[in-house]
From Swiss-Prot:
A Pfam family recorded for this sequence: DHQ_synthase
Subcellular location: Cytoplasm
Cofactor note: Binds 1 divalent metal cation per subunit. Can use either Co(2+) or Zn(2+).
Full protein name: 3-dehydroquinate synthase
GO biological process, one term: aromatic amino acid family biosynthetic process
UniProt gene name: aroB
Reactions catalysed: 7-phospho-2-dehydro-3-deoxy-D-arabino-heptonate = 3-dehydroquinate + phosphate
Organism: Actinobacillus succinogenes (strain ATCC 55618 / DSM 22257 / CCUG 43843 / 130Z)
Domain of life: Bacteria
Class of the enzyme per the UniProt entry, highest EC level: lyase
Function: Catalyzes the conversion of 3-deoxy-D-arabino-heptulosonate 7-phosphate (DAHP) to dehydroquinate (DHQ).
UniProt-listed Enzyme Commission number(s): 4.2.3.4
InterPro entries xref list: Dehydroquinate_synthase (IPR050071), DHQ_synth_AroB (IPR016037), DHQ_synth_fam (IPR030963), DHQS/DOIS_N (IPR030960), DHQS_C (IPR056179)
Length: 362
């Protein structure tokens, strides 16, 4: 088992990474008599709800659960209200701990519920997808979607512990594994060139779910993100760098309808658009753009804009991005592999050219 600590100004919390942790009571920061509500979904519940419940019962916790529908399209105020209703019906108070058992959607919705219920209760992240293990479970971003934009309603709210059991990836559909690798590749591209080179050597092992490489990879991603979050918890500076490809990607998700493309798939295509724009600005060599493209392709991820979405469709969605300031786009771009920066006033015509460069032509 590995442990990565997230060091915040006022406190710290651990991220435990290893095999079989769902049944390891020592990683749960709970004691006998504690009240716990598990938030999960209809896909994860048959796989892991009983296992986690049994572990909590062994500790002596009072355990209940709430079951949400599975998928990005259920990352809504309706799902949030479903959690609140369950908490209220069972008379849960401020001493309750909420546990998010599932992927990024469950973590985001449950985290926002924990941030909001009675002005804040404790919560634990147990991410079961690769994307949530390397990214969304770490750092305290919680949110639900609005029909006009992704993650528009939310809060920064940190868990007290993150428990990453890598054996949960064995039940993950291949498409979901690949989607998680988009965020993995992102880390190397923005902040860690040696890690990018490691990925070029090991990406096939990650696709094949090699446990040794997976645990190394997840821990490294968590360390990168933990370091960034420690410096900038509420995304007023460096933390924005973690959003490579996300402004383009969120436009894809919103335009197509949540869930048609997985988040990681949209991030992969969006990262290629960011790389293409970086090249057009004279920052990134064409050979490096090709390396990024090859790595995404080896992870079976899209590198082009989806069919049915025109380049002109992007900008209206992108102008609603949370990083927009004074009506101007702020985009995460690359100076070089492993060196990202925030471009504060990019010519929209150049942005459109980059999108065209990543659009399939007949």
């Amino acid at each position: 088992m590995q442990c990565v600590n997230v060091e915040l100004k006022e406190r710290r919390y651990p991220i435990y990474i290893g095999e079989g942790l769902l049944t390891d009571s020592s990683v749960y920061p709970l004691k006998s008599g504690d009240k716990v509500m598990i938030v999960t979904n209809e896909t994860i519940a048959p796989l892991y709800l009983e296992t986690v419940t049994d572990t909590l019962n062994q500790i002596g916790c009072q355990v209940s659960h709430v079951l949400l529908k599975d998928g990005e399209k259920y990352k809504t105020l309706g799902s949030l209200n479903q959690i609140f209703t369950a908490l209220l019906q069972e008379n849960h108070g401020r001493d309750t701990t909420l546990i998010a058992l599932g992927g990024g959607v469950i973590g985001d919705v449950a985290g926002y519920a924990a941030a909001s219920y009675q002005r804040g209760i404790k919560f634990i992240q147990i991410p079961t997808t690769l994307l949530s293990q390397v990214d969304s479970s770490v750092g305290g971003k919680t949110a639900v979607n609005h029909e006009l934009g992704k993650n528009m309603i939310g809060a920064f709210y940190q868990p007290i512990t993150v428990i990453i059991d890598t054996t949960t990836l064995n039940t993950l559909p291949k498409r979901e594994v690949n989607a998680g690798l988009a965020e993995v590749i992102k880390y190397g591209a923005i902040l860690d060139y040696p890690f990018f080179e490691w990925l070029e050597r090991h990406i096939d092992n990650l696709v094949a779910l090699n446990q040794q490489d997976l645990q190394y990879c997840i821990a490294r991603c968590c360390r990168i993100k933990a370091d960034v979050v420690a410096r900038d918890e509420t995304e007023k500076g460096d933390r924005a760098l973690l959003n490579l490809g996300h402004t383009f990607g969120h436009a894809i998700e919103t335009h197509l309808g949540y869930g048609n493309w997985l988040h990681g798939e949209a991030v992969a295509a969006g990262s290629m658009m960011a790389a293409a724009l970086s090249e057009k600005l004279g920052n990134l060599a064409r050979t490096d753009v090709a390396r990024v493209e090859k790595l995404f392709a080896r992870a079976n991820l899209p590198t082009l804009s989806p069919d049915g979405m025109q380049p002109e469709d992007y900008l209206p969605h992108m102008m609603r991005d949370k990083k927009v300031l004074a009506g101007k786009l702020r985009l995460v771009l690359l100076k070089a592999l492993g060196q990202a920066y925030v471009a504060t006033d990019t010519d929209p015509a150049l942005v459109l050219d980059a999108i065209y460069a990543c659009t399939q032509t007949d």
